[in-house]
């Protein structure tokens, strides 16, 4: 149980020059510490790459930490635990000669200090070990009342899900109910094709859209469960995913499997009660792709393509739910446009984890395309717009459709021009923005169908 933690708030690196590093701890806290220190205490600890130990190891209290690295690789990771109440922060660096030291493996991963929290980690190339201050119930009894405040929190996210009972929270997080972007990206291709199948001069069938909306939510949730069950070992090693319920052992595989079974039953019940047989068969045929996707990142650099096959299946099913079958001249280019769209947004999304993906050994288009991502995704963006144009031609859409689709392309241009592939926050922002692209194109289809000449629509149906 970690009793005290080190706050890494201010730091700087200087030019490399030797094989050792000096860690300067500056205490700006004038309160009394466990060792009865008063005022400002300064402790310098020097460790050497060759002997891998610390000297001058003493108890200190620190609100500010400065690292001066004089090695070729920064010694400290930029991740830290922060004291819950921002009060005294104590740690001990014990003599490495002690046999009971708790060792912390060194790690050279470098992330953003101000945005992340994690245990203190040192560069693994230096094989240096440090010990942390453990809770000792036999000493410092004055701090017993505060010990719970100094423990790393087991609540991963303080959001609206946290208001639910503890037994329910893991299932909600497993379903990603707090991250609806996946539902929107799954639903929009369904709504596109439902709208394209609507009669000329008419709004799309809202009841069918509602059915597909519920189905998109349930199936996306089921897909997340399948993905997390397959990837729990990888997820536990990736900073962004290590708090997922299965990876963090909040849920067992048995509990997750039961939950998945309930979701699939609900989905099949909805499909059987609401859709025609052609569409039922079409929806059922997508299930192998859904199950296959989580495993593809082990074998190919193109799991995003498989995700595109699954996520855009609604471009086929939505049309057949209205028309009774697929008009392939319309839905085929729409489906291909959707796959290309997925390649764009999910490659951007994958750039968030590319460093961790290399460490754990999984593949993605982010790693495959690397520094050429912007150019390659520009090609896929062109395929998105081309597929939408071909769909409009096959569906005999009015001029407004083509003007609107051309305007939609500006969103794809914007996100590829402004995304910083080396900044996870930028990647996430651009990924989420794709829900706007999906909505824009849906509105364009709806307005275009209202403007469509009914005589031209009859000619299409005869084909």
Swiss-Prot record:
Gene3D superfamilies: UbiA prenyltransferase. It is a multi-pass membrane protein. This protein may be expected to contain an N-terminal transit peptide but none has been predicted. Pathway: Cofactor biosynthesis; ubiquinone biosynthesis. It comes from Dictyostelium discoideum (Social amoeba). Residues 137-150 have a biased composition (Low complexity). This is 4-hydroxybenzoate polyprenyltransferase, mitochondrial. It comes from the Eukaryota. One of its GO terms (molecular function) is transferase activity, transferring alkyl or aryl (other than methyl) groups. GO terms for biological process: isoprenoid biosynthetic process; ubiquinone biosynthetic process. It is an enzyme of class 2 (transferase). Keywords: Isoprene biosynthesis, Membrane, Mitochondrion, Mitochondrion inner membrane, Transferase, Transmembrane, Transmembrane helix, Ubiquinone biosynthesis.
């Amino acid at each position: 149980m970690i009793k005290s933690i080190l706050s890494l708030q201010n730091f700087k690196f200087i030019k490399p020059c030797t094989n050792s590093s000096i860690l300067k701890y500056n205490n700006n806290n004038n309160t009394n510490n466990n060792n009865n220190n008063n005022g400002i205490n300064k402790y310098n600890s020097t460790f050497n790459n060759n002997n891998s130990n610390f000297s001058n190891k003493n108890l200190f209290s620190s609100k500010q930490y400065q690292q001066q690295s004089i090695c070729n690789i920064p010694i400290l990771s930029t991740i830290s635990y922060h004291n819950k109440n921002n009060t005294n922060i104590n740690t001990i660096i014990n003599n490495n000669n002690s046999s009971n030291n708790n060792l912390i493996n060194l790690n050279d991963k470098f992330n953003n200090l101000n945005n992340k929290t994690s245990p203190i980690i040192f560069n693994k190339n230096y094989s240096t070990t440090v010990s942390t201050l453990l809770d000792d119930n036999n000493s410092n009894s004055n701090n017993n009342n505060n010990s719970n405040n100094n423990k790393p929190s087991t609540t991963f996210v303080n959001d609206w899900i946290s208001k639910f009972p503890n037994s329910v929270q893991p299932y909600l997080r497993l379903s990603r109910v707090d991250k609806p972007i996946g539902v929107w990206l799954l639903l929009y291709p369904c709504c596109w094709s439902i709208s394209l199948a609507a009669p000329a001069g008419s709004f799309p069938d809202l009841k069918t859209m509602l059915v597909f909306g519920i189905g998109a939510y349930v199936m996306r949730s089921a897909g997340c469960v399948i993905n997390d069950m397959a990837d729990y070992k990888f997820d536990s090693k990736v900073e962004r995913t290590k708090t997922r319920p299965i990876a963090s052992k909040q849920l067992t595989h048995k509990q997750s499997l039961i939950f998945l079974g309930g979701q699939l039953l609900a989905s099949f019940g909805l499909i059987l009660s609401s859709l025609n047989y052609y569409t039922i068969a079409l929806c059922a045929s997508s299930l192998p792709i859904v199950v296959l996707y989580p495993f593809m990142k082990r074998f190919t650099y193109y799991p995003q393509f498989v995700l595109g096959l699954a996520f855009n299946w609604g471009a086929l099913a939505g049309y057949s739910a209205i028309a009774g079958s697929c008009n392939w001249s319309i839905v085929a280019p729409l489906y291909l446009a959707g796959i290309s769209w997925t390649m764009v947004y999910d490659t951007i999304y994958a750039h968030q984890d590319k460093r961790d993906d290399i460490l754990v050994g999984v593949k993605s288009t982010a790693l495959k395309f690397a520094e050429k991502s912007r150019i390659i995704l520009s090609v896929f963006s062109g395929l998105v717009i081309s597929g939408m144009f071909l769909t409009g031609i096959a569906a005999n859409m009015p001029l407004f459709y083509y003007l609107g689709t051309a305007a939609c392309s500006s969103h794809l241009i914007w996100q590829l021009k402004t995304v910083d592939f080396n900044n996870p926050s930028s990647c996430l922002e651009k990924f989420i923005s794709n829900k706007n692209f999906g909505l824009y194109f849906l509105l364009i289809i709806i307005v275009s169908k209202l403007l469509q000449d009914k005589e031209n629509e009859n000619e299409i149906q005869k084909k």
